[in-house]
A protein has these predicted regions:
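Short, Asp-centered acidic motifs that coordinate Mg2+ and/or phosphate
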Residues: 33-35, 53-54
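Mid-length scaffold segments of soluble, non-membrane domains
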Residues: 37-39
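Conserved beta-sheet core of the metallophosphoesterase superfamily
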Residues: 41-119
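Beta-strand-turn-beta hairpins that frame and shape the catalytic cleft
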Residues: 1, 20, 27-31, 91-98, ...
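C-terminal domain-boundary segment and adjacent tail
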Residues: 114, 118-131
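Binuclear metal-dependent hydrolase catalytic cores centered on His/Asp/Glu-rich metal-binding motifs
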Residues: 1-34, 44-45, 110-111
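Flexible, glycine-rich phosphate/dinucleotide-binding loops
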Residues: 7, 107, 127
Length: 131
C-alpha cells in the first residue's frame, strides 16, 4: 500500500482502496499466510482489520533521533513526538504482527543514535511437513 501522501489531493482515500484490493486478493486463498507491505505504520487499526497475519512497513525512520535505552524514537514523520511505531515488532490484536523497519535512508534531520537497518524476516511454517 503506497504512502497516502503520494495520492492526489482529491483522492485522500487512495491508500484505503489499495488496502481493500490487497485484502480481497489475500482472501482468495484462506490457507495462505497473508503478508501486507505498506509504507506507513500508524494506520494500525485498518491493518489489523484487513485480514493479514504480517504487516511490513517503514516511513518512521526509527524515530530519527533516539535516546539509547530510553525511548523508541523522539520524532517520526506523521506520528510526531514520541512515536508509538518507530521501529521494531508490534502486535496488532491477537493475530496480526507488524514489523516496522528503521530503514536505510534519512529525513531532513540527521539520524542520532539511530543507525540504518535492513530487516530480514524468516517465515517458517508451523507445520514443517507442509513446507
Amino acid at each position: 500500500v503506497d504512502d497516502p501522501a503520494g495520492f492526489p489531493k482529491n483522492s485522500p482515500a487512495g491508500w484505503q482502496k489499495q488496502l481493500a484490493e490487497c485484502g480481497r486478493a489475500a482472501a482468495e486463498n484462506e490457507n495462505a499466510y497473508r503478508i501486507l507491505l505498506c509504507h506507513r505504520p500508524e494506520r494500525t487499526e485498518a491493518y489489523a482489520e484487513s485480514g493479514f497475519e504480517l504487516v511490513l512497513c517503514g516511513h518512521a525512520h526509527g524515530g530519527q533521533v533516539r535516546v539509547p535505552y530510553l525511548i523508541n524514537g523522539l520524532y517520526a514523520p506523521n506520528q510526531g513526538l514520541f512515536p508509538k511505531y518507530a521501529g521494531g515488532c508490534y502486535r496488532l490484536g491477537n493475530d496480526v504482527t507488524m514489523i516496522v523497519s528503521r530503514g536505510l535512508c534519512r529525513n531532513e534531520l540527521p539520524r542520532v543514535f539511530n543507525p540504518p537497518e535492513l530487516v530480514i524476516v524468516d517465515i517458517k511454517s508451523k507445520n514443517p511437513s507442509k513446507g
